[in-house]
Amino acid sequence: YGGEKFQVSEYTMSEIIAAVYEVMEDTGIREGILFLDEINCVSETLAPAMLQFLQYKTFGQHKVPEGWIIVTAGNPPEYNHSVREFDIASWDRVKRMDVEPDYSVWKIYAYEQGMHPAILTYLDLKKDAFYSVENTVDGKHFVTARGWEDLSQIMCLSEKKNLPVNLNLISQYVQDEQIARDFAIYYDLFKKYKNDYQ
């Protein structure tokens, strides 16, 4: 990589850093973003190595190439029981940015991705249904941007194959019973009016 020879194994150059060098070699791209998801789910035994990586951009003696930045993401503990709370030493090595769901921003992405029009028109009317997480005595009830996107994909596929899109299907992706029921009713009306006006 970069004119130098390295052996890549779990005991030498990190697979993560090796992947960056491979991208550079394969594409000629010399700068970019190295994205690490679920950073706060790293096991306690890997925490020291992760701290070193975040602060110095190195694993052992191998450094992330110049021109590459590290971006990480993690979910809050209320969304994932595997999360380990960062201590002050960890927080001191990162720039924290809390991201909140915003339908108007997501809608631009969703439109570009070809999101099912029933979902977009429904959420235009019911913005509160876009993102919701509730803990009740009956368990967790939630709906997320990922759930809507996954639902859109299965709806498009189901319609193409003439398979039913019903409450049973919708509830697998929209895991809030009230919102799932409301959307199922809306979808039935959406289909009816779509058929009437074609």
What positions do the PLM features span?
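Short, functionally important secondary-structure microenvironments
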Residues: 195
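Short, Lys/Arg-enriched charge-dense amphipathic segments
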Residues: 60-61, 80-92, 139-164, 188-192
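Non-catalytic, well-ordered alpha-helical scaffold segments
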Residues: 48, 145-149, 177, 181
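Non-catalytic, alpha-helical, charged scaffold/linker segments
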Residues: 166, 170-192
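Conserved AAA+ ATPase small/helical "lid" subdomain
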Residues: 107-174
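Generic hydrophobic, helix-prone segments enriched in Leu/Val/Ile
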Residues: 16-20, 158, 183, 187
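AAA+ P-loop NTPase catalytic core and its hallmark functional loops
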Residues: 1-128
